[in-house]
A protein has these predicted regions:
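N-terminal beta1-alpha1-beta2 module of alpha/beta enzyme domains
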Residues: 1-78, 82, 182
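Hydrophobic faces of well-ordered beta-strands that scaffold small-molecule active sites
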Residues: 3-7, 33-35, 84-86, 114-118, ...
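Active-site mouth loops of central-metabolism enzymes
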Residues: 4-16, 87-97, 178-189, 243-245, ...
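Short, acidic/polar
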Residues: 13-25, 99-102, 187-196, 256, ...
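Structural motif
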Residues: 28, 109, 199-200, 335-337
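Short helix-capping segments at alpha-helix termini
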Residues: 28, 79-82, 109-110, 154, ...
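Conserved, mostly hydrophobic/aromatic
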Residues: 29, 37, 75, 106, ...
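An alpha-helical appendage that flanks or caps ligand/catalytic pockets
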Residues: 134-175, 212-334
C-alpha cells in the first residue's frame, strides 16, 4: 500500500521542544508535518479542566496556538526531507498577496517542501477578532487566483479586478525555489469547494468521511479539473484524521465515548450527522463554521456532548487496534487516498 503519512506539528510552547519533535519526526520517517492556523481552539473554555482532560494540568487554556508559518520555517530550515504545511489557513485573515510572499519565502527556507493548506475559514478565528465573516468560499476562489497570479508573476506587473480582491500594477519579484510554485492543498467538502480543488489545487485535505463519500468527492475534483483542462497526474488526495489506537475493543470504545473526542465531532459537516441518523448537534443549519467556543456556556457543552453518540466518534476518527486501522486505511487507499 503506497501511502504517505503525516503527523501533527506541536502547537504549544515551548517551541524548542516543538522544533526538536519536528526533527525527530523526520528521523522516524514521517512524510509531512501539519499545523492548524488558529487563534482559538475548538474546545470551549467552560469544559477545559482536569475533570474533562488531563491536558488541563499542563496547558492552562484550550486556545494556545503558535503561529504555524513560524514553526514551518524553524523546522523546515533544520530538516532535509519532511514536508511542512498548514492544515489549514484562510484568506479572510490573511491577504492572498501576503500568503504568496510567505509561501515563496518558506519555499526557499525548506528547499521546496512547504505546502499551503487552505480552507474557507471558520467563524471562531474571524468574527470575534473584528474581521468580517462574509462569502468565505467566494473570497477563497478569488484569492486562489490572486495567489497563482503573484506566484507566477516573475518581474511582470499584475492586474486583477475581482469582487473581493483587487491588484493594480502589483509585483512579486520573489521567484519559487525550484521550477514550480509551492503546492496548494484545499480542505474541501462541498460541491463548490471540490470543484475549486480540481481547478486550482495540488492536493486535497478533507476531514474523515466514508470511503464511498471519499471516492465520490474525488470524482468531483477530477470533474472540476477537466472543466478547465487541468492535468491531475501529480495531484495528492489526502485526509486529516485522528487516530484512536487501543489493544482491544473495550479500550477503543472507552476512547470513542470520551467527552473530548465527542466534542471534536462538531467539526463534521451536518450531512455526515444526517447520514448516520443523528440530528446535527448545533441545531438548524448551524455547523462547525458557525461554532465559537469562547461563547459556549457549560450547560450547552453538556447538551452538545449528549447529542453526539459514540457511533459518531467512530465515524469521525480512525479507531481500533493496529490491525483494524491498517485494514480501514487500506479501504481508503482503494478509494484513492494517498496521504
Amino acid at each position: 500500500m503506497d501511502i504517505q503519512l503525516g503527523a501533527p506539528g506541536q502547537i504549544i510552547p515551548p517551541v524548542d521542544r516543538g522544533i526538536s519533535l519536528g526533527i525527530k519526526m523526520e528521523k522516524l520517517g514521517y512524510d509531512a508535518l501539519w499545523w492548524p492556523d488558529h487563534l482559538m481552539g475548538w474546545h470551549p473554555d467552560t469544559m477545559w479542566n482536569e475533570e474533562f482532560t488531563p491536558l488541563a494540568r499542563h496547558q492552562p487554556s484550550s486556545h494556545v496556538h503558535v503561529d504555524p508559518f513560524a514553526m514551518m520555517a524553524a523546522i523546515g530550515a533544520q530538516t532535509e526531507q519532511i514536508r511542512v504545511g498548514t492544515c489549514v489557513t484562510d484568506l479572510l485573515r490573511r491577504h492572498p498577496a501576503s500568503i504568496a510572499q510567505t509561501m515563496l519565502t518558506l519555499d526557499h527556507m525548506t528547499k521546496g517542501r512547504a505546502i499551503l493548506g487552505l480552507g474557507s475559514g471558520e467563524q471562531l478565528n474571524i468574527e470575534p477578532y473584528g474581521i468580517e465573516w462574509d462569502k468565505p468560499v467566494a473570497k477563497l476562489a478569488e484569492g486562489l487566483e490572486v495567489i497563482r497570479l503573484l506566484m507566477n508573476a516573475g518581474n511582470e506587473k499584475v492586474d486583477f479586478e475581482g469582487k473581493h480582491f483587487r491588484l493594480q500594477d502589483a509585483v512579486m519579484g520573489l521567484d519559487p525555489y525550484g521550477d514550480r510554485h509551492p503546492e496548494i492543498w484545499l480542505a474541501a467538502h462541498g460541491p463548490r469547494m471540490l470543484s475549486l480543488t480540481g481547478q486550482y489545487a495540488d492536493g486535497w485535505l478533507p476531514t474523515k468521511m466514508s470511503p464511498e463519500a471519499y471516492r465520490d468527492s474525488l470524482d468531483r475534483i477530477h470533474t472540476g479539473a477537466r472543466e478547465v483542462g487541468r492535468n491531475l497526474d501529480h495531484f495528492v488526495p489526502g485526509m486529516l484524521g485522528y487516530l484512536l489506537v487501543g489493544p482491544d475493543e473495550e479500550s477503543v470504545n472507552r476512547l470513542l465515548a470520551s467527552e473530548m473526542i465527542r466534542m471534536l465531532c462538531i467539526l463534521m459537516p451536518n450531512w455526515v450527522f444526517e447520514s448516520l441518523g443523528v440530528p446535527p448537534p448545533l441545531g438548524g443549519d448551524a455547523g462547525f463554521h458557525d461554532f465559537i467556543p469562547s461563547r459556549i456556556p457549560r450547560h450547552e457543552v453538556d447538551r452538545i456532548i449528549k447529542a453526539i453518540p459514540p457511533k459518531v466518534s467512530a465515524h469521525y476518527a480512525f479507531a481500533g487496534t493496529v490491525e483494524q486501522l491498517v485494514e480501514e486505511i487500506a479501504s481508503y487507499h482503494a478509494a484513492g487516498l494517498r496521504h
